[in-house]
């Protein structure tokens, strides 16, 4: 419950008190009795209803006249006595710093009362001060912050606080000020004693006495006390250099005095509050013993009232650093402790003597002393430039209040010479500090000696006369003052030009800055001061509106030079900041915290795109551990999700060739190609099953990876369309200039290749040698730096070789990989013909694309060396696969026997079989059981999936061939076999490579297909064209001998035996293969294979090259198919043996056909049996021209 108001205490505690004692009429007493009853009735009401009534009552405001409902008689009855009269009362706003309080003031002839108006129309006394302890002043800006109307305000204070009292009108303000000053002086005349001893302590001042006791009068101000104490302490200087502080027991910390306070009243008030004086003397003027003031020394230190003299520069620093001093009696919130800003003032570099000049001092010094060669100090110029730049865009500039502590801290920094970054300060703080600087110029910037002349300017006739008068007065000012005025009015003019947005017209600016520009030389009456203030405001308004005519047009360009310097400095700081971030681009924190719209994004364009540090901006960190290990290269199609599929086809070609020319590592062993992760591929060839893998293409790229050969023009083009996403993309997705040159050189080769193929289709001429020769020349010129990579496939790359893919692919994706035109594509399905024409017509029809993949894998191997090793290790055989190898060995031996039988009969593989097999090199390598030169089924560098067990088994199986040039010695470790095979293949000469094709083996096969193909009748025409595009070497005819001459006769015999073989194979039920990765059954594919087996046997089909399906996770494949291989092997073996037995009787009559048929059939059967889980199976028939088809 609230404490009782004074009138309630009086009336309630003394109900029989006579009204005559209060000095109030009985009528008033009756009214007070009614008031008492009303108050008591309110207290008896319930709390909710009372609160509701209070909420609905109108809150009093300063501008309102005293409410008639507020009855002051009861309140005054406790204050008025026989010798005390009420002079005036009214409402006013008391402001201290940023705090504003509405109070009701009562002025008696000897007492000043401040009361708070309560909502129940009662008063609560907040302060009761003797007039002899009070003071008044006009320094409104020193006490209050913000927009204070000096016309209606003045400073009012008592020990030891200062307030800005604002009244409803200037008349009210003048009336209150005159009454206060008059009765304060009257009460001071009654003081006794008129003077008291005052002890002054010197602090932070060297070479002076510690303390001195001086005698002060009751009318001496703080500045006058400073002037008296300086010589007694042995200090030279003026009161502006020092400040007087008060340390009393009532305050937690010393309080600085502005200069207009009365130390006499402060000490006497403290004595009365300390109960040193008699109780009767507190409210009276009874004299007391002169020795009693000296009893202050006997009090505890915390109760003593001490006056401390400090340098003025230290005074502000002490106030900032001392957290114990609470200006507004408010504690700092512990919640915001992280945002507390401590003072950065350095107090250790102070001069030892106060008389020596203080370096860096700025405030309170005349302009000629701080301006060297009439140039403004840098802090002042920086503030003016900042205000000129930000002020026109700030609403209420120079008018809105600023934080007092921030202003004092900035002022101290500027005054101490510390470099200050104004960008970190509020614009209002800077404006307030600038006004403070102008206010501290001795004699004002317009010179107080010319005050009367300045005020009389506005009395001139017209504007011309006023301007001439102003210019004559400016000539009388020091040059430094004129320079500052030119800059100052340039800023004010610029702000005034934008008054529509900042609401600061010339009049508003003049009202705010006039008190800081000109003031009278001596104090005068309030009436005169108000009149002079109005005239000065009108003068400043006139100067702002006519500054261009007074100071010249050039004041608008004064800040251009400063602006250029500042812009240069800002750019330098931005560049240093950007380089600092770049120097630590290996940090994951910088990568994670990087925003696409960061400030450095604009700076990137300024710096140009040639910087190597751009790679840290354009790559992703590999911190993302939850992403799959499938990696690849980014293409623009990954960014532009809105473009059509046709656009996607057109965009893929220029991007896919980027790594071919820029990502070359010459000293990496060739066998390392096989270590590439099986899922690495360009997104252009990713199938639907690998769509998710493509999305994480460059996700694991290290941010510290150097950028390699990217072009500024390409980077700028990409940034224009993919501004945000490109920052996280890899520069590998950019087409380099080398690719463009490569395409230009390739165009004539393409035309020549097409012409040759057309001729071959008409005449049947073998053009493979010419194509291989041209192809070899081109590869040597374009990729000679790759060393063994170039020598590996000279003259022997058939047309069907394309960029290897390491992810499961559909038939549609497989068809996209063909590097030749659709007219020469022997197995391109019709539904992909249109897609092939666009991106592939510009490539030479006989050009192998395996070299591109070699370079890509070489590049990827350099980046993912650790992950390749991990992938290779993960590609180890499971226990089931080891058993599978044992079964495979036995099948190899049996297959070899069948081959030997065919060799005994003298049947050689003809030219057609070699031609047919060479065209199948587009498919991934798989296990092959081939006659004679089966060594060529080894997985080619850069195309064999790392850790592929079946691909390695192909190498192991090929060692059994009698005529193989390269024979691995181990089959226990498929991975080792693959590497050994590749090491051997590096050393093969072109002749051996060509010989492998003629003898029926497809050279370095490219692991391309990812689905089990089946035969389609409608692709026979395409196969015919591809048959003639096979690369052959003349030396192969020498090795084959007579068998090569009999090759054409075998075709007719094979046709005759074809119907009979179909009947033999038809009863065989289709073997049920394991489910394919694509989820489509392969029964149809196997049925077609079995159906076509006799046909191929009759026609002398060459050994089939099968491809191992590439899988991104080898363990999944092995686990998925481990249960099916054995049953499938046995079924196919039985089929093979039965076919062999039916064909064998006819071998005696035919010199080569039946053994050849037997060899072919056995080769096909064992091949399928040994690799039941392999993805695609390609069976090529020259005569029937069957094409493999994905299921």
UniProtKB/Swiss-Prot annotation:
Annotated PH domain residues: 78-180
Sites marked Arginine finger: 399
Annotated Gene3D superfamilies: Pleckstrin-homology domain (PH domain)/Phosphotyrosine-binding domain (PTB), Rho GTPase activation protein
Region feature (Disordered): 1-45, 768-791, 926-1014, 1052-1123, 1140-1191
The Ras-associating domain, residue ranges: 194-295
Taxonomy, superkingdom: Eukaryota
UniProt record, GO biological process: regulation of Rho protein signal transduction; regulation of small GTPase mediated signal transduction; signal transduction
Coiled-coil ranges per UniProt: none
Primary role: GTPase activator for the Rho-type GTPases by converting them to an inactive GDP-bound state.
Identification of the protein by name: Rho GTPase-activating protein 20
Organism: Homo sapiens (Human)
Designated gene of the protein: ARHGAP20
